[in-house]
Curated annotation (Swiss-Prot):
InterPro entries: Ribosomal_uS7 (IPR000235), Ribosomal_uS7_bac/org-type (IPR005717), Ribosomal_uS7_CS (IPR020606), Ribosomal_uS7_dom (IPR023798), Ribosomal_uS7_dom_sf (IPR036823). One of its GO terms (cellular component) is small ribosomal subunit. Keywords: Ribonucleoprotein, Ribosomal protein, RNA-binding, rRNA-binding, tRNA-binding. It comes from Limosilactobacillus reuteri (strain DSM 20016) (Lactobacillus reuteri). HAMAP family: Ribosomal_uS7_B (MF_00480_B). SUPFAM superfamilies: Ribosomal protein S7 (SSF47973). One of its GO terms (biological process) is translation. Disulfide bonds: none annotated. This is Small ribosomal subunit protein uS7. Part of the 30S ribosomal subunit. Contacts proteins S9 and S11. The keyword Ribonucleoprotein applies. Belongs to the universal ribosomal protein uS7 family.
């Protein structure tokens, strides 16, 4: 944590093909070992597959998937009097986006399809239809927050 003021957030430039900052962030989350070109190829191929399969604009399908995956509440461990409580807190907008992207990529990697292109396309389509592992993760997170609502007064 810096002692001199606030750290400036890095400006995310919009993606050249779809002109979307969210797509750029997805490329960043897909990227492994700094291989942006590979991540970009995978994403664009997945978007082509989404367009072929659904017939809709892939960016709109992706945005719908993000809306269905982004959590509103999460739990955070808080130590009070020698015991840890899972305290439900609201998720900040930037963290909501980050968690949504992270979960989509994480659960796409765990899927059974042969290529990452197919896995990512299927996970985004499933998430836009409110099914799939990433949506289940959001529901589990919300369920955990709801179960620990009694500890909400420990919020800080």
């Amino acid at each position: 944590m810096p002692r001199k003021g606030h750290v400036q957030k890095r400006e995310i430039l919009p993606d050249p093909m779809y002109n979307s900052k969210l797509v750029t962030s997805l490329i960043d989350h897909l990227m492994i070992d700094g291989k942006r070109g590979t991540a970009t190829k995978i994403l664009y191929a997945a978007f082509d597959e989404i367009k072929n399969e659904t017939g809709n604009d892939p960016v709109e399908v992706f945005q719908q998937a993000m809306e269905n995956v982004m959590p509103v509440l999460e739990v955070k461990a808080r130590r009070v009097g020698g015991s840890n409580y899972q305290v439900p807190i609201e998720v900040r907008p930037d963290r909501r986006t980050t968690l949504g992207l992270r979960w989509i990529v994480q659960y796409a990697r765990l899927r059974g399809e042969h290529t990452m292109v197919e896995r990512l396309a299927r996970e985004i389509i499933d998430a836009s239809n409110n099914t799939g592992a990433s949506v289940k993760k959001r529901e589990d997170t919300h369920r955990m927050a709801e179960a620990n609502r009694a500890f909400a007064h420990y919020r800080w």
